[in-house]
Amino acid sequence: MASAQEDLIDYEEEEELVQDQPAQEITPAADTAENGEKSDKKGSYVGIHSTGFRDFLLKPELLRAITDSGFEHPSEVQQVCIPQSILGTDVLCQAKSGMGKTAVFVLSTLQQIEPVDGEVSVLVLCHTRELAFQIKNEYARFSKYLPDVRTAVFYGGINIKQDMEAFKDKSKSPHIVVATPGRLNALVREKILKVNSVKHFVLDECDKLLESVDMRRDIQEVFRATPPQKQVMMFSATLSNEIRPICKKFMQNPLEIYVDDETKLTLHGLQQHYVKLEEKAKNRKINDLLDSLEFNQVVIFVKSVSRANELDRLLRECNFPSICIHGGLPQEERIKRYKAFKDFDKRICVATDVFGRGIDIERVNIVINYDMPDSPDSYLHRVGRAGRFGTKGLAITFSSSEEDSQILDKIQERFEVNITELPDEIDVGSYMNA
């Protein structure tokens, strides 16, 4: 888990360049390159434009390699998955080819790896040797400035004695192994490859791997030989409803992302509603919601620093345990407040969009957009804070103008979701894990 200081390095708030308005008074109560042909091949994703890879707080060596590859903006899959995957969360992701699934597990494992000579930390399984080489090339591309990290590929059809050579010298043996299931199981069974130090277990094109009885058996045998506490990530372009439960048997409370096409991205388990109201009624409504809803922790998003400060002050006057975080704070104070919220000292955080990118608090299960986000992209960043580690969350968006209504329409169209009006009563079980 990253430290609070690491979580908050180098955030900039271009989004806050809006005209400040005082809060109302409150009343109490690709695949990146899934081609892998040339390590210097340029590419670009049509992703969320306000976010760059630097917002994920990756190692400088990784950012440099990403820049060399010509990638500027992460794809939607990457910007939803990477903030969680680099924290060790299990991931089950379905998205068509070209959306950057490979880069999710390559970057997240390289971010977390601490190479030790003679120890394999990462296992990546795939169903063909061609795909294995593509993945190895991706590791080579992104680890070019991490000279101590070594990757090797293994597959059937060649004498296993050749594979033994790769593990003889600990100073040269791989930390990351990409392999087909049959050969990997043979290496483990013959005690050529020791898997007692594995921390990351990845299946690429997992449906192909798990639908085959033979490959599934090999995978299960290798899986059982690895430590019980490890990160498991599975990716595929196609993931039927029948295969998903099988995938999840290998996982613990995974982040589930299913992208059926370039526009549709569903955060499963997230209830999404709007409230139509006048600007002057927002504070009364936020007060009512905080009184009536059950929550672990809440993030309330506003559009400017001054509104964050004012709303935070008003909430505290009403005895709500609030704290505010925005880019106008000195770095040291920002880290201190972030840590207080992360450590559960405070249950309510009023924030600007600085909190909507790559920041993850396990207990947050409700997000309230006090001010409408300025774009569908910003909406996705914000509501993604809720229920990230679990399967349930609640997002409530205030709409107080015609412009707000238009943005809400764009959000629903972009992500093909139906955001309904907040009902008078909402079932706690729909947004709180039991």
Swiss-Prot record:
GO molecular function: ATP binding; ATP hydrolysis activity; mRNA binding; RNA helicase activity
Keywords: ATP-binding, Helicase, Hydrolase, mRNA transport, Nucleotide-binding, Nucleus, RNA-binding, Transport
Residue span of motif DECD box: 204-207
UniProt subcellular location: Nucleus
Domain of life: Eukaryota
GO cellular component: nucleus; transcription export complex
PROSITE patterns found in the cross-reference section: HELICASE_ATP_BIND_1, HELICASE_CTER, Q_MOTIF
SUPFAM superfamilies per the UniProt record, alphabetical: P-loop containing nucleoside triphosphate hydrolases
Residues reported to bind ATP: 95-102
UniProt-listed Gene3D superfamilies: P-loop containing nucleotide triphosphate hydrolases
CDD domains named among the record's database cross-references: DEADc_DDX39, SF2_C_DEAD
EC category: hydrolase
InterPro entries assigned: DEAD/DEAH_box_helicase_dom, Helicase_ATP-bd, Helicase_C-like, P-loop_NTPase, RNA_helicase_DEAD_Q_motif
EC numbers on record: 3.6.4.13
SMART domains registered for this protein in UniProt: DEXDc, HELICc
Region (Disordered): 1-43
Enzymatic reactions: ATP + H2O = ADP + phosphate + H(+)
Residues in Helicase ATP-binding domain copies: 82-257
Family the entry assigns: Belongs to the DEAD box helicase family. DECD subfamily.
Domain notes: The Q motif is unique to and characteristic of the DEAD box family of RNA helicases and controls ATP binding and hydrolysis.
Described purpose of this protein according to its UniProt entry: ATP-binding RNA helicase involved in transcription elongation and required for the export of mRNA out of the nucleus. SUB2 also plays a role in pre-mRNA splicing and spliceosome assembly. May be involved in rDNA and telomeric silencing, and maintenance of genome integrity. Links the mRNA adapter mlo3 to rae1 for targeting mRNA-protein complex to the proteins of the nucleoporin complex (NPC).
Complexes and interactors: Interacts with mlo3 and rae1.
UniProt protein name: ATP-dependent RNA helicase uap56
Organism encoding this protein: Schizosaccharomyces pombe (strain 972 / ATCC 24843) (Fission yeast)
